[in-house]
């Protein structure tokens, strides 16, 4: 054995050993790399036999022959290390009829290989020389009795008689006239021994094998292999075509072993009906014998197999609907047999293999352990993101989405996460308890050209339904829906910021640049917006808001030309003492009417977020909106004194038209640069601002007990002032416009 005597021990023996009838002990062992093996321990006096067996095992390589690993000399004897196997005598009780039939076929192939390719004879084919590997295949061992056909002399046979099975010795060797068999009949001795072994195994076969086939096979054995005349025993290859070896399991196994030799037509026909043939087999047989043959690169490359068979093997059995074909394996068998194979396939970097694995990942991924998912599956799946194949990248992204539910986004995606998408959705069912920002003044506080989204039925969620007359047409494009503003308030839109209300129609001069950017309060700013609204609509509109005492709902329904809306509550102010004006530029002016010869401004800054107090319900309000196509867009409610109701002024005009404000359209700005724009003086308004005559466009004749209503251009929406004590310019120190000193 040469250098093997000094070789370090590279395995560890496990207890207990199994002792063969010949006295040979077989130990299970574990190699240094973690693989399993079997160690045959021979006595030192049998060193020649061990060397002979090791020589044959090294030179003879066949799937049905025991695979040799190493041979060393130890203190307790000579150790022959092979692949992990167990004696057939131990495993026979756990095997099914199909496995026994397939095992007999394996031993038959091994003997044919020895006879035809090696020109050797085994000389001891018996139960103790057959072993079962981990994958279920039967392996032929006991190679210490193997010799060439010409060397099987009577003397050699007598030398190995102590380790031979007496039942396997043919009758001709008992004759004193026995001589060496000729080369053409060298297989006769092994044929008889094989016939004896098969006959003993047929007794354990159950009803899975047809009685007719079994009876026919037994007759063939007696007439051929067990024939007492050696020359009448045919070669073992003649048994390969017998019906005993024509079962579904064996045919599937044989076809898969020779898959590379089959034509495309044969493979298509085979995989097309493979599911029907495999379904009749036991789950244990499929898991132990067929799974390694079906889950490999060759089968994954067959389109028919991928479409018609693999979906039923790549997932465990589950509750299925009526008429659906269930999967082949139970969850327990799938976990123990299929998952280890899939782990190995994930390390195969072939495109067609990865496509098949990821296409069915949802069916089996939950059967991996957390450690397997993190250390094997996830790293291998992530490799697909860097592949040049678009299909690999697409299926990889889909698989990562599946892994998120098992490993969590922190493991799959990595890094810190932040809330980017907020849960905001428009709500179309809200109560009518309106705060200041829900009031009609705030809802209709901006010109429709400033807001691009124009929604239909804007007041349906603001006012009670009883105020809508069935015969009153409403042009929904002229209004702005309250839900739009609610959405802006929720999402942090500039409209949700506190609005600074101007005094006397003039914006606060102390507004910062940030405020001017966030809220378009000037008409100039609004003109710079793109015209996303309806361009074909008339530019001039007049909207009058009048405050009336409460009337029954039936009276309101009788008005067909106006839209009267009754508000249940107003916040933060009293209806009898507050006038609210909305200018076209988006600013809101709030003033108190003159009651005792002095007028005081209302604070210009009202917060939309502070808690509001309910208004007094002594004077409920109605809001009437009248549209005119020839007037500019303006909304201005008339003033109502706290002591008296507004009196109706008899005139030739229509009802309420005396309060209509005639507004001139703002002139278009000169495109040329104004070199003196920075020289315009900045004049802060006093407590009461005197309206200059040039700013007035129309004055309604003063009537008794009626406050005059003045109309101004769209540039200034100044409050009505009747006092003349407040002066914009000093009377005594009038400015000299010709003076060059200032």
UniProtKB/Swiss-Prot annotation:
Gene Ontology molecular function: ATP binding; identical protein binding
Expression tissues: Ubiquitously expressed.
GO biological process: cell migration; inflammatory response; neuron development; protein localization; spinal cord motor neuron differentiation
InterPro entries noted in UniProt: ARM-like, ARM-type_fold, CIK-Related_Protein, HEAT_type_2, Kinase-like_dom_sf, Prot_kinase_dom, Ser-Thr/Tyr_kinase_cat_dom
Protein location: Cytoplasm; Golgi apparatus; Cell projection, Lamellipodium
Region (Disordered): 506-544, 568-598, 629-652, 723-742
Alphabetically ordered keywords of this record: Cell projection, Cytoplasm, Golgi apparatus, Lipoprotein, Myristate, Phosphoprotein, Repeat
Domain Protein kinase: start-end pairs: 2-245
GO cellular component labels: cytoplasm; cytosol; endoplasmic reticulum; Golgi apparatus; Golgi membrane; lamellipodium
Taxonomic superkingdom: Eukaryota
PTM per Swiss-Prot/TrEMBL: May be myristoylated; myristoylation may target it to Golgi compartment. Phosphorylated.
Biased composition annotated in UniProt, kind: Acidic residues: 529-539
Subcellular location, principal: cytoplasm
Residue spans of the HEAT repeats: 199-238, 285-323, 333-370, 372-409
Residue positions bearing lipid (N-myristoyl glycine): 2
Positions of region (Interaction with EZR): 548-742
Pfam families in UniProt: PK_Tyr_Ser-Thr
Residue numbers carrying Phosphoserine: 439, 707
Function as written in the Swiss-Prot or TrEMBL entry: May play a role in regulating cell adhesion/migration complexes in migrating cells.
Subunit structure: Interacts with EZR/VIL2 C-terminal domain.
Similarity-based family: Belongs to the protein kinase superfamily.
Domain notes: The protein kinase domain is predicted to be catalytically inactive.
Protein name (Swiss-Prot/TrEMBL): Protein-associating with the carboxyl-terminal domain of ezrin
Gene: SCYL3
């Amino acid at each position: 054995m040469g250098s093997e005597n000094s070789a370090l021990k590279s395995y560890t023996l496990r207890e207990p050993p199994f002792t063969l009838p010949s006295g040979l002990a077989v130990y299970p062992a574990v190699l240094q790399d973690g693989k399993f093996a079997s160690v045959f321990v021979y006595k030192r006096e049998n060193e020649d036999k061990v060397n002979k067996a090791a020589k044959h095992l090294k030179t003879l390589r066949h799937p049905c022959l025991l695979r040799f690993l190493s041979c060393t000399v130890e203190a307790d004897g000579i150790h022959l290390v092979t692949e992990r196997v167990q004696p057939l005598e131990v495993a026979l009780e756990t095997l099914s009829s199909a496995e026994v039939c397939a095992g007999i076929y394996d031993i038959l192939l091994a003997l044919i290989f020895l006879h035809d390719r090696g020109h050797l004879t085994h000389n001891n084919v018996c139960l103790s020389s057959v072993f079962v590997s981990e994958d279920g295949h039967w392996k032929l061992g006991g190679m210490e009795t193997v010799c060439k056909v010409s060397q099987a002399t009577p003397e050699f046979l007598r030398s190995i008689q102590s380790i031979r099975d007496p039942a396997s010795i043919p009758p001709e060797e008992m004759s004193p006239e026995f001589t060496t068999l000729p080369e053409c009949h060298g297989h006769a001795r092994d044929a008889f021994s094989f016939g004896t072994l098969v006959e003993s195994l047929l007794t354990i076969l159950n009803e899975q094998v047809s009685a007719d086939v079994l009876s026919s096979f037994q007759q063939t054995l007696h007439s051929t292999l067990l024939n007492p005349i050696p020359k009448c025993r045919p070669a073992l290859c003649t048994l390969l075509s017998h019906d005993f070896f024509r079962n579904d399991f064996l045919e599937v196994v044989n076809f898969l072993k020779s898959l590379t030799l089959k034509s495309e037509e044969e493979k298509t026909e085979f995989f097309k009906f493979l599911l029907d043939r495999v379904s009749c087999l036991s789950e244990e047989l499929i898991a132990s014998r067929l799974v390694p043959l079906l889950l490999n690169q060759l089968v994954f490359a067959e389109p028919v197999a991928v479409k018609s068979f693999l979906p039923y093997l790549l997932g465990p059995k589950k509750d299925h609907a009526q008429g659906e074909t269930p999967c082949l394996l139970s969850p327990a068998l799938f976990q123990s047999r299929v998952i280890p194979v899939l782990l190995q396939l994930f390390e195969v970097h072939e495109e067609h293999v990865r496509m098949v694995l990821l296409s069915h990942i949802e069916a089996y991924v939950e059967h991996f352990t957390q450690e397997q998912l993190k250390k094997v599956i996830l790293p291998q799946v992530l490799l697909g993101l860097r592949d040049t194949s678009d299909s690999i990248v697409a299926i990889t992204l889909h698989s990562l989405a599946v892994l998120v539910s098992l490993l969590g986004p922190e493991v799959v995606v990595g890094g810190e996460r932040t809330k980017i998408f907020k849960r905001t959705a428009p709500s179309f069912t809200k109560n009518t308890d309106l705060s200041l920002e829900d009031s009609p003044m705030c809802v209709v506080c901006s010109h429709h050209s400033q807001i691009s989204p124009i929604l239909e039925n804007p007041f349906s969620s603001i006012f009670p339904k009883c105020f809508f007359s069935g015969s009153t047409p409403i042009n929904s494009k002229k209004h702005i829906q309250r839900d739009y503003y609610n959405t802006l308030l929720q999402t942090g839109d500039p409209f949700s910021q506190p609005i600074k209300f101007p005094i006397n129609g003039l914006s606060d001069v102390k507004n910062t640049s940030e405020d001017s950017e966030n809220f378009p309060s000037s008409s100039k700013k609004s003109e710079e917006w793109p015209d996303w609204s309806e361009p074909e609509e008339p530019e001039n509109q007049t909207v009058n808001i009048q405050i009336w005492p409460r009337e029954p709902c039936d009276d309101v329904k009788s008005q067909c030309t106006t839209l009267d809306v009754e508000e249940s509550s107003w916040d933060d102010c009293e209806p009898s003492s507050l006038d609210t004006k909305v200018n076209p530029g988006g600013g809101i002016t709030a003033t108190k009417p003159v009651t005792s010869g002095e007028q005081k401004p209302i604070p210009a800054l009202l917060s939309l977020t502070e808690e509001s107090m309910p208004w007094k319900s002594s004077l409920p309000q109605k809001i009437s909106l009248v549209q005119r196509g020839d007037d500019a867009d303006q909304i201005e409610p008339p003033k109502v004194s706290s002591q008296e109701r507004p009196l109706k002024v008899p005139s030739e005009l229509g009802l309420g038209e005396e309060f209509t404000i005639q507004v001139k359209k703002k002139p278009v700005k000169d495109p040329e640069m104004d070199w003196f724009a920075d020289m315009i003086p900045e004049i802060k308004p006093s407590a009461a601002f005197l309206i200059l005559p040039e700013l007035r466009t129309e004055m309604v004749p003063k009537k008794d007990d009626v406050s005059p209503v003045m109309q101004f251009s769209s540039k200034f929406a100044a409050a009505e002032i009747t006092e003349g004590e407040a002066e914009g310019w000093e009377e005594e120190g009038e400015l000299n416009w010709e003076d060059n000193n200032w």
